[in-house]
């Protein structure tokens, strides 16, 4: 059952494949904003996946984020969610 307070977390290491250059959202080899959004959605899904009925899923419908600092290759990024 979905309840307020359910939490999720997703982590990944910044690599060339999730960089702004690879995602075509910039030219630098730093963590891309589209990658950050995807990681946030992973955390949100992980928070509720065990509570979803078979065949059900989640869909992101609204994001309001600030990506305020560049994260270089090799650093770990963590996204946390709370329902």
Q: What is the role of each PLM region?
A:
Residues 1-3, 38, 55:
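Short, conserved, surface-exposed binding loops centered on an aromatic residue
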Residues 1-32:
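Catalytic strand-loop segment that frames the active site of acyl-thioester-processing enzymes
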